Amino acid sequence: MSFRSLLALSGLVCTGLANVISKRATLDSWLSNEATVARTAILNNIGADGAWVSGADSGIVVASPSTDNPDYFYTWTRDSGLVLKTLVDLFRNGDTSLLSTIENYISAQAIVQGISNPSGDLSSGAGLGEPKFNVDETAYTGSWGRPQRDGPALRATAMIGFGQWLLDNGYTSTATDIVWPLVRNDLSYVAQYWNQTGYDLWEEVNGSSFFTIAVQHRALVEGSAFATAVGSSCSWCDSQAPEILCYLQSFWTGSFILANFDSSRSGKDANTLLGSIHTFDPEAACDDSTFQPCSPRALANHKEVVDSFRSIYTLNDGLSDSEAVAVGRYPEDTYYNGNPWFLCTLAAAEQLYDALYQWDKQGSLEVTDVSLDFFKALYSDAATGTYSSSSSTYSSIVDAVKTFADGFVSIVETHAASNGSMSEQYDKSDGEQLSARDLTWSYAALLTANNRRNSVVPASWGETSASSVPGTCAATSAIGTYSSVTVTSWPSIVATGGTTTTATPTGSGSVTSTSKTTATASKTSTSTSSTSCTTPTAVAVTFDLTATTTYGENIYLVGSISQLGDWETSDGIALSADKYTSSDPLWYVTVTLPAGESFEYKFIRIESDDSVEWESDPNREYTVPQACGTSTATVTDTWR
């Protein structure tokens, strides 16, 4: 078998493969490759089996393998929660091989929640606000910006997502006995401490942060619904969620979202882009109150934040207001001399992909006085009004926004390494990667942006019933319940349908049918849901190929459409061999393809000397499924 792809991920790039990757023709094909790279990299950073994090305990998500300049070899509750939410969404959309990773994470959090630390302990709940821990599940006792109050909310959201899947698939006792007690601890923390100051997600400002408040509101809303679903209740969620939403409105300045109170900075910060995308609800309208991605407030803020970086990075010189630029944390940043971050640039793209989804779902978009400047920068003829999806103006605006969004991802493509690796930052002048290598959050950001680009969205968190702002805000808190949880073992869970079991993109995890079709010796499975939903415009198609190879050989996928290189071998999509065994010589790749697209394809074998061997005729044929709720499909082939 060939370890060539794996070696590339660990930095040992083979010249032939590097040349192939460097010739990627389109953003689509790059993203198809990069999504596989990102998923593998995330798993490489999770203990105990992660290839890059030897010594990390099982289920511990390590921020980066970097141990010096800077030392990020720790686990942050915030980063871990965001990363696991990404994996949970992938799992619910069909990647069932992630089950053990999710279980190990939850088991690890049962231990982490109980660790006494400089912020406190579990008995008072205060210890849940500790930002980071050692990778061996012990307290980090050095000086740090603590507490950080976003972590418990994000961890709750990640676990609720998995808990809901358990409920939808008949594992009620597991959701009730294992997941709910851990979620309850985090919800109790949010309800008790949300109105106290803490450090922001960048660990620098001690005050009140938009990102923190936004994700806390979301957690309590979906936490209350989850409590009901497991036969319990969360009165502290119900009493505090409206008050948090009320307070959230105070971050709106009239022209942009203020990132932090108690800060001398301008307040323009990617914090607010991240807050919007991590509270995105695919069922929501363009609500200003929750700063939904398509809301006038969020769009106006997007322009203000992005524009704040146009003149301060050499990389952005000469780019017009209608062009994407490299995006950092905030314009006053001095960490590593202040540079763009991969995850911030991707957040700018993801918000726009979210907005495109919301406009498409509601069948119109609205330009208001608040959002007009955003639209005019991209479409000079924009004027206030509501535009139906059947209008030419709607089409022109949507095309401009999609191009703008893709521009941010293209910047990420430019500065990612040839093997797909992404650090924390890239230099504002020459684009070279900086700071911690292989940042786990960078890879999670790539996966979520790519999914949103392809209309693959997470489950609703209940925004539609939680967007009404109280007439008067009250600075309150509520006491919940804290309890120590020990996870000794998990029951046997069968994620039916192999790698193609999926929840609908709009929320339900109840899979009711699996259909199979065949075409030219290819077995195809797709997954659908019985609930009402939208039809995604793209489907994540996994190509599984059984092919025995020798060391130095690699397998690529080529075909008659641009996403598969238009038959150009140099633009083929590399398959991964990280699951290859002598008894099961599996090569695979997941490619996002337009729903309903019909095409021909073949696999090719590239030798160590870069010579190409085509499999035998005839060409294989495939039509991407296009149906309500169908977001994934799998094609099973054998080399011939």
Swiss-Prot record:
Q: Which terms in the GO cellular component ontology are assigned?
A: endoplasmic reticulum; fungal-type vacuole
Any one Pfam family here would be CBM_20
**Annotated segments matching region Disordered:** 498-533, 616-640
Boundaries of each CBM20 domain copy?
533-640
- Please list the reactions this protein catalyses: Hydrolysis of terminal (1->4)-linked alpha-D-glucose residues successively from non-reducing ends of the chains with release of beta-D-glucose
For this UniProt record, the keywords arranged alphabetically read as follows: Carbohydrate metabolism, Cleavage on pair of basic residues, Disulfide bond, Glycoprotein, Glycosidase, Hydrolase, Polysaccharide degradation, Signal
Q: Which GO terms describe its molecular function?
A: glucan 1,4-alpha-glucosidase activity; starch binding
**EC top class named in words:** hydrolase
Write down the glycosylated positions: 195, 419, 465, 467-468, 476-477, 483-484, 486, 488-489, 492, 496, 499-502, 504, 506, 508, 510, 512-515, 517-518, 520, 522, 524-532, 534-535
User: Which stretches does UniProt call biased (Polar residues)?
Assistant: 628-640
- Disulfide linkages recorded for this protein, renumbered to the chain, are 234-237, 246-473, 286-294
Note the pro-peptide positions: 19-24
InterPro entries assigned: 6-hairpin_glycosidase_sf (IPR008928), 6hp_glycosidase-like_sf (IPR012341), Carb-bd-like_fold (IPR013784), CBM20 (IPR002044), CBM20_glucoamylase (IPR034836), GH15-like (IPR011613), Glucoamylase (IPR000165), Glucoamylase_active_site (IPR046966)
Q: What is its EC number?
A: 3.2.1.3
Its transmembrane ranges are none
Q: Which PROSITE patterns match?
A: CBM20, GLUCOAMYLASE
Signal sequence bounds: 1-18
Locate the active site.
Answer: 200, 203
Binding site residues for substrate: 144
Which GO terms fall under biological process for this protein?
polysaccharide catabolic process; polysaccharide metabolic process
Report the sequence similarity comment from the record: Belongs to the glycosyl hydrolase 15 family.
What is the protein's given name? Glucoamylase
Q: What species is this protein from?
A: Aspergillus niger
